[in-house]
Swiss-Prot record:
Protein's UniProt name: tRNA uridine 5-carboxymethylaminomethyl modification enzyme MnmG
Record function comment: NAD-binding protein involved in the addition of a carboxymethylaminomethyl (cmnm) group at the wobble position (U34) of certain tRNAs, forming tRNA-cmnm(5)s(2)U34.
UniProt GO BP: tRNA methylation; tRNA wobble uridine modification
Subunit structure, as described in the record: Homodimer. Heterotetramer of two MnmE and two MnmG subunits.
InterPro entries xref list: FAD/NAD-bd_sf, GIDA_C_N, MnmG, MnmG-rel, MnmG-rel_CS, MnmG_C, MnmG_C_subdom, MnmG_C_subdom_sf
Organism field: Ureaplasma urealyticum serovar 10 (strain ATCC 33699 / Western)
Localization (cell): Cytoplasm
Pfam families, A to Z: GIDA, GIDA_C_1st, SAM_GIDA_C
Amino acid sequence: MKKYDVIVIGAGHAGLEAAFATSNLNLQTALITLDEKGIGMMPCNPSIGGPAKGIVTREIDALGGIQGKAADATTMQMKILNSSKGPGVWAIRAQIDKIAYQRWFKQQIKQQKNLDLIIAEVSDLLVENNIVKGVILSDQKIIQADYVIITTGTYLKSITHRGSVCVDEGADGTKNAKFLSDVLVKLGFELIRLKTGTPARIKKDSIDFTNMVLEPGTNQKIAFSHYHPVYKPYDKQLPCHIIYTNEQTHQIIRENLNKSAMYGGMISGIGPRYCPSIEDKIVKFSEKPRHQIFVEPESYELDSMYLGGFSTSMPIDVQEKMIRSLPGLEDCEILKYAYAIEYDAIDPTQLYPSLESKLVNNLFFAGQINGTSGYEEAAAQGLMAAINVSQKHKNKEPIVLGRDQAYIGVMIDDIVTKGVVEPYRLLTSRAEHRLALRNDNADDRLMKIGFEIGLLKPEVYDQYLNNLKQINEVLNWLKTTTVGQIDDLKFTTLKTNSYLIDYLKRPEVKLNDLLIYCPIKIEDEQIINKVQIQVKFEGYIKNQEENLKQLKRLNNIKLHGIVDYKEVPNISLETIDKLNKIKPLDLEQASRISGVNLTDIAMIKYYLERIKND
């Protein structure tokens, strides 16, 4: 068969991002997948974005990746999350038409140069002298390549669970990968067993929406893609709805806990902390009288609704009782029952920050096989693995994004340095520099890199540079124009020799209020938004940078005075659990524990100072 520069195993979100990046970088690429049904599939929540994750998709786009364009082209609803808070946590979330999303990618694959799609199962890796040379398919055909990127998602020896019923299959009834786990073990890789799950799907026409809380989208023009945006008109967007569990729901779950695959002992894999099953919520948060559930559409073409926040591994008969105890779903028709899925992943500490294996040269890993969760996290890793394949092919140094450069850098540093014990999810709290890692400035942080490596098209980069020029011109005007020079502003409480940039820092003042006096005509809302954020939050960003410098000097502070970390205020349950288990000797050791961030370290330091002074 034809020899390729790169083979990508798996056509999920990591694999697609990797394959499009390598082929766009002029590397002959083979994309191998078990089943065409799995291309770009969204087996769980059909959405892209959310806190931290939406910023990651913006970062992917800034580097020249494809996920943002796909999401914009197939969205059913767009929202800006956390808009009432500071810009460090603003994020875009899109409800995606999962049928259109897959169709979009399949069409792009057909049109993509340097990319061949192969429907087959990889049964072995060709490795000589610790260098990967290609793959062997299950029909014994050999495909040679200089590099291999493994992006098998949740399919390695995957098993689905509904109560005591276990099925040897992949997500949504697809085929699973039966051979690669054993191949990796023989090569010396340590594997971990993880678990995730997905809720039931309900027939839309059987739902009573009367008493549900309506969750519409936004009429603002927002998109993931910086310079190729596709906007979904407000009147074409589909609404989501919110309902809540009740005591009847909780009682059904409590009475049947032993039938749950997870609580009945059928599942050994560790599930995601930040996306727990409904059983987990009832057990771990027993004091809560109700839990929120999102009722969300899956496609313009499907009459199915997704119950976000209601995943379970209960048997079918129990699921029916649980679902019909929910308001509006009393007489619903269940189209597909929930399930949990177990799968193999590698310990990601066996990877370099480039995502290349430490054990086998030219072998890269990306996505959920690295112990992460989420479409956005997967796509970001696929992109970075592809970029570093290209860098190595050109005999250049790998591109490793810093924690202060991108959420992508935070994630990769976390998983390769600290490893994972549960499916890793990106959170804004994991980033020490989150005021600098904003939704609005992904282009400032990463477009130069995307352009220099050859992924970002020159015309896109030129447009970015033109926008940057306008931003700097407006900032210069604000810095050099005094209040006294504007007749309408002479009677403000600011001194007339104060500059407009100081006036703009007032919370009640908007940049649009001042631009009417500006000789530079700016109409692009993206430019206006970026200038306003830079000015209004300049002080916060400088303070955060200073705090980070101080926190780096805390390494010699001992922790033997803390018996139980529940005593420490304002740290998460995850942090408490891990600190109580590991019992770090000092703050330096505590800071290296997965899930413990610099905010937690600051809270611990404050607590130690307080008990010392008491």
